[in-house]
Regions:
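Conserved redox-cofactor binding core of oxidoreductases
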Residues: 108-224, 228
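Glycine-/small-residue-rich beta->alpha transition segments that form the dinucleotide
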Residues: 12-13, 34-37, 217, 244-246, ...
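Alpha-helical support elements that line or immediately flank enzyme active sites
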Residues: 106-110, 253-259
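N-terminal glycine-rich phosphate/pyrophosphate-binding loop and immediately adjacent elements
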Residues: 1-124
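Short, hydrophobic alpha-helix immediately C-terminal to the catalytic nucleophile
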Residues: 16-20, 198, 257
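Core beta-strand elements of the Rossmann-like FAD/NAD(P) dinucleotide-binding domain
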Residues: 2-4, 237-246, 250
Length: 259
């Protein structure tokens, strides 16, 4: 019977970041991911994510309920189904949330660690920014962040037009002030996508404290005395029960509540 310190349900962006931190602190971690490895060359190419949008094995689509505000239309909602989650298939735009959003988290939880002044330290620790530095940016973290290598003329014209309409130029949308117009940065380094697998998990693949189960779905939590002590999974038609001291659900906004 397998037993772990932590079982991470969902090997997406938050799941892989959480796993890396736990493993570096000496804990035995199991990552359970419904999708595949993110080793398709197209995934690492900055322009390769576009062909992945249609019929991709790395995405799973859900249908929304009818939306009254949109004339009752239903919309497809894409969720990553691959190790690394959204960091493996997204458009690579590096954009933090607004400070006011994080401060509302701190207010709602009564925990200042969820506030902007605290979380900015986590962002800095993760970031390896190739242009920006200072109080709000990191330059030696694992996640590479860079300016766009090519800027379409239409983008330059748009920026000039918005400036003529009175919007200020913003050289950094991630320093706490997101007002204005400018160019965004991307999680790209050395011409390749910098996802959480290549940056955080691949360096730990030989670590005895890391185990990864791919193509595996968690169908329910195992509860004993009102505490989650494990998960029941299915993979290729085979059911398995796996136990851990703590279960962390990082299966995305749609699947985490479902579990």
């Amino acid at each position: 019977m397998k037993n772990f310190d932590f079982i991470i349900v969902g090997g997406g962006t938050s799941g892989t970041i959480t796993s890396e931190k736990l493993i570096r602190n000496g804990y035995k971690v199991l990552i359970i991911e419904e999708g595949k490895k993110n080793n398709n060359p197209l995934l690492s190419m900055p322009a390769g994510w576009i062909p992945m949008l249609d019929g991709s094995p790395y995405l799973k689509f859900y249908k929304s309920i009818p939306q009254p505000q949109l004339n009752n239309r239903q919309h497809d909602i894409a969720q990553a189904k691959v190790l690394g989650g959204g960091s493996s298939v997204n458009g690579m735009v590096y954009m933090r949330g607004k400070p006011s959003d994080y401060n509302r988290w701190a207010e709602a939880t009564g925990d200042e660690r969820w506030g902007w002044n605290s979380l900015i330290n986590n962002y800095k620790a993760l970031e390896n920014n190739q242009r920006l530095a200072g109080e709000t940016h990191g330059t030696d973290g694992p996640i590479k962040v860079s300016d766009p290598g090519y800027v379409a003329e239409g983008s330059n014209l748009y920026i000039k037009t918005m400036q003529k309409l009175g919007l200020p130029y913003n050289r950094d949308f991630n320093d706490g002030n997101q007002y204005g117009v400018g160019l965004m940065q991307y999680t790209i380094g050395d011409g390749k996508r910098c996802d959480t697998v290549s940056a955080l998990i691949n360096p730990l693949l030989n670590d005895k404290n890391l185990e990864i189960m791919l193509n595996t779905v968690v169908i329910k939590l195992i509860i004993e005395n009102k505490k989650a002590i494990g998960v029941e999974t299915i993979s290729n038609g085979k059911y398995e029960k796996i136990y851990g001291k703590e279960i962390i659900l990082t299966a995305g906004a749609l699947i985490t509540p479902k579990i």
